[in-house]
């Protein structure tokens, strides 16, 4: 009986210690928050640009279909209209692979922009060959020449080209907003023959880039921002 009581007391003590430790553990936060970053309250029409990344047929009728691609495309259409309305520059980014390559083959229909999201005459087109929209392109030069300080980044895929572009943008001096529902990704195979669901990967990718590099909003929240 004494042994049972001693065991119970030890168990209760361990539980109490665990609860005390949990209470003392800081709530999860981001490096941006710890660094004092504040939510964006408005957009400057002269200093903000919209990047529209890789809305190409490969992700819709090709080898890498994106489950939520159409939803993201429709929200990006709204962002493009918003940018045009406020005379913000819009940059359409496309990925091109070798003409005989397996993905985004140059000259193929899979490398073409989706028919429902095409650049207009006033939009600029950037062609890249890596996940980042900055590597091997003159995007940074064009943005700086236009006086751009802030980027709204939409596109495919969230964990790859959207994230890579955001991560490269910040060291170049830009602030970044990612409208989360204007981006999307696909199910991903892992090294141990498992599958990471696209919704799980989407959330993890956004959380990863939001820690340091980007402010995450919805499309509705971006469209509701005052423009000056």
Language-model features: where?
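Bacterial N-terminal signal peptides
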Residues: 8-17
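Short acidic, Gly/Ser-rich segments with clustered Asp/Glu that frequently serve as metal-coordination loops
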Residues: 58-61
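…and closely analogous acidic/polar surface helices at protein-protein or active-site interfaces
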Residues: 64-83
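Active-site-adjacent betaalpha module
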Residues: 21-49, 77-81, 86, 98, ...
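Bacterial N-terminal signal peptides that target proteins for export
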Residues: 1-8
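Surface-exposed patches in mature extracellular/periplasmic domains of secreted proteins
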Residues: 92-93, 155
């Amino acid at each position: 009986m004494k042994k049972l009581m001693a065991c119970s007391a030890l168990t209760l003590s361990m539980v109490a210690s665990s609860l005390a430790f949990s209470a003392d553990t800081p709530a999860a936060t981001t490096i941006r928050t710890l660094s004092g970053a504040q939510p964006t309250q408005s957009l400057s029409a002269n200093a903000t640009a919209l990047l529209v990344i890789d809305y190409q047929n490969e992700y819709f009728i090709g080898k890498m279909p994106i489950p939520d691609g159409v939803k993201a495309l429709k929200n990006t259409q709204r962002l493009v209209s918003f940018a045009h309305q406020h005379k913000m520059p819009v940059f359409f980014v496309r990925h091109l692979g070798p003409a005989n390559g397996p993905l985004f083959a140059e000259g193929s229909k899979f490398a073409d922009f989706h028919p429902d999201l095409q650049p207009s005459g006033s939009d600029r087109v950037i062609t890249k060959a890596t996940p980042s929209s900055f590597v091997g392109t003159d995007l940074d030069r064009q943005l700086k020449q236009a006086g751009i300080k802030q980027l709204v980044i939409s596109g495919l895929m969230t964990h790859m080209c959207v994230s890579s572009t955001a991560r490269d943008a910040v060291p170049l001096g830009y602030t970044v907003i990612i409208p989360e529902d204007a981006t999307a990704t696909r199910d991903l195979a892992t090294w141990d023959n498992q599958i990471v669901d696209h919704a799980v990967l989407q959330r993890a990718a956004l959380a990863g880039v939001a820690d340091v590099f980007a402010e995450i909003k919805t499309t509705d929240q971006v469209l509701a921002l005052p423009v000056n």
